[in-house]
Regions:
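Sequence-level preference for short, compositionally simple segments enriched
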Residues: 1, 287, 296-297
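Conserved beta-strand/loop scaffold segments within soluble protein domains that form the structured core
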Residues: 24-29, 33-286, 290-293, 303-308
Length: 308
């Protein structure tokens, strides 16, 4: 596994990796595998059906282990479609850290479309973190279009955190989660756009089983002339509980649309949605400025706290 300074910076940004990961990992770089390691309980293998990507199989009862599967692109002009499938056994408790970083110093677009599908066994808990980051001084675009599909069996839970740090010119995120009996999905989405960037998020959580629970927490900041559109949808098909909360800060000449939807197909479904868009309150800025912060520092402090 050979790493340049650019590689190291991208891996630290998107996966908090410094040096070789501990445990199971697969590092994808510029369409190829730059390093892979399995463990006794987590097996990572390349696709055998002609598609690009990997299969991750986690044994029943695996607890306290991490699996890192970051993707980095360091060359302009790369366009890739990757399929990663996760088969998680019963009674597991694992952390999966993904993410994609694009460094583009050229004139051609670089694009990563990643399709992740999770099959989570009974009474297993998965924490899944996915961060996106882009940099480089080229004129070519940095484009990411992730798709995540999750199937939760009885009593299974997933805690999903998706973060777009900065530097992604265009993204369309699609998320679908199906919850069985007593299953729970908690999705936290954090996003910042600036310049003329465009971000769209289409999310659907289907609460199919009795006792299923779903929660969506979306927080975003739009600066410059950037554009954000959110479509979170919670469907209650049994005795279940679902909550959607979308909060956004709009600045400059940006545009934000937040269109939450709740759909009940059972008289026993309890569903709530909340959405708010606003600017930074002037009294918040003034308070921090009286403590010695410049207007720019005060603004940055508020935004960090909001997205934390």
């Amino acid at each position: 596994m050979m790493e340049s300074q650019v590689d190291r910076e991208l891996l630290e940004k998107i996966a908090d990796l410094i040096g070789k990961p501990v445990g199971a990992f697969n590092i994808r770089k510029d369409t190829g595998c730059d390093g892979r390691q399995s463990t006794e309980n987590i097996q990572i293998t390349g696709k055998t059906d002609g598609k690009s990507g990997i299969d991750i199989r986690i044994k029943d009862g695996t607890k306290g282990e991490q699996c890192h599967i970051p993707v980095i692109i360091t060359k302009p002009g790369i366009q890739e479609l990757v399929y990663n499938d996760f088969y998680i056994g019963e009674n597991c408790d694992v952390d999966i850290v993904a993410g994609c970083g694009i460094h583009n110093c050229g004139g051609e677009d670089s694009r990563h479309d990643g399709i992740h599908t999770f099959y989570v066994g009974k009474h297993s808990h998965v924490k899944y973190t996915e961060k996106h980051y882009g940099d480089g001084d080229g004129t070519g675009g940095r484009i990411m279009n992730p798709q995540t599909v999750v199937y939760l069996e009885e009593g299974a839970t997933i805690q999903m955190e998706t973060v777009q740090i900065r530097g992604i010119d265009s993204t369309k995120r699609e998320t679908k989660i199906v919850c069985g009996k007593d299953a729970e999905a908690v999705v936290t989405e954090r996003l910042m756009t600036h310049g003329d960037q465009v971000a769209e998020s289409d999310m659907e959580i289907s609460l199919d089983g009795e006792g299923a629970r779903g929660r969506v927490i979306s927080r975003s900041v739009a600066k410059g002339t950037s554009r954000q559109v959110f479509y979170p949808k919670m469907m209650g098909n049994a005795a279940c509980f679902g909550h959607v909360q979308c909060d956004s800060i709009i600045m400059d000449d940006a545009h934000i649309e937040s269109i939450p939807a709740i759909v009940a197909n059972s008289t026993e479904a309890q569903l709530i949605h909340e959405a708010a868009i606003g600017k930074i309150a002037g009294d918040q800025l003034l308070k921090l400025e009286t403590l010695g912060l410049s207007p720019e520092e005060a603004e940055e402090c508020i935004l960090k706290g909001f997205l934390a």
